[in-house]
């Protein structure tokens, strides 16, 4: 997985153009090739607005991220959700990210899900990510939803 550090800004990417290489954010200089991406079909079942609006989507800042002992998949996130108390969320994304590359990032979480114990640790929410499969391959890609670091911890998404 490529680093998302600020130090990569201004470097020339594989296409030879300067831009915010490896930041995960679109800039006019970034050329993205989606020709080898297979997207799952949209759900046909609809969710009424009242049900959807019960989900509390918040910007969260990654204070710490470590692998969960005895798990190959889980990462344990310590997050600032703007409440003044740390929030712990576990996510099965270790195959796609190394913990240290996520510290300091701003992510999106659903914060009002009931707590769930995994590997002896209580997870209090869910981090949002996008997942797709490469065309003509069984290889799956996962991209954690990262947003602008100027968004404060606890900001509500509408």
Predicted regions and their residues:
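Phosphate-backbone binding interfaces of nucleic-acid-interacting proteins
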Residues: 1-158
């Amino acid at each position: 997985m490529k680093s998302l550090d600020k130090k990569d800004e201004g470097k020339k990417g594989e296409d030879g153009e300067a831009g915010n290489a490896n930041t995960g954010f679109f800039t006019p200089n970034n050329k993205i090739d989606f020709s080898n991406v297979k997207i799952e079909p949209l759900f046909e079942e609809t969710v009424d607005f009242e049900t959807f609006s019960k989900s509390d989507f918040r910007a969260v800042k990654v204070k710490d991220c470590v692998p969960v002992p005895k798990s190959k998949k889980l990462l344990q996130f310590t997050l600032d959700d703007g409440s003044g108390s740390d929030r712990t969320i576990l996510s099965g994304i270790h195959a796609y990210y190394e913990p240290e590359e996520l510290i300091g990032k701003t992510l999106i979480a659903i914060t009002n899900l009931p707590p769930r114990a995994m590997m002896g640790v209580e997870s209090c929410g869910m981090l949002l990510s996008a997942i797709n499969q490469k065309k003509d391959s069984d290889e799956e890609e996962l991209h954690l939803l990262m947003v602008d670091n100027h968004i404060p911890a606890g900001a509500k998404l509408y």
